[in-house]
Design a protein with these regions (language model features):
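Conserved phosphate- and dinucleotide-binding cores of soluble alpha/beta proteins
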Residues: 1-117
């Protein structure tokens, strides 16, 4: 819920390499008017797994840090993350998660931040 991207692992199992993602993200952030946009479906495994998760698995490799992600896009909308507080980042990401998973994400949000969503 913070905006970091894990694109090479499922759990602790590596499924791909980084490719050019890090270079592309850094280039976008360094260019005049550039923005990083992470576009993805909100779910995986035929809708059984949310791709927006409250925590990454311990030991999973972060491909792109939360500081480098400007926008995350799913079929449910756009979350603008740049310049947002951790609470606002989490709210924005929950807002673009698949509706079937939002309740669970909100529960974790409320536990973590000790406040109502």
């Amino acid at each position: 819920l913070m905006g970091q991207v894990v694109s090479t692992c499922v759990g602790l199992r590596q499924i791909s390499g980084v490719g050019g993602q890090v270079d592309f993200v850094r280039g976008a952030n360094m260019s005049r008017g550039g923005r990083t946009i992470m576009a993805m479906p909100s779910t995986a495994a035929k809708g059984t797994i949310s791709k927006i998760v409250p925590l990454i698995d311990e030991g999973a490799a972060v491909t792109t840090s939360r500081y480098d992600v400007n926008y995350v896009v799913t079929e449910y909308g756009i979350a603008q993350l740049k310049g947002k507080t951790l609470k606002d980042r989490a709210r924005a990401l929950i807002g673009i998660a698949h509706p079937d998973f939002r309740e669970g994400l909100i529960k974790v949000y409320e536990e973590r931040f000790h406040c109502k969503f």
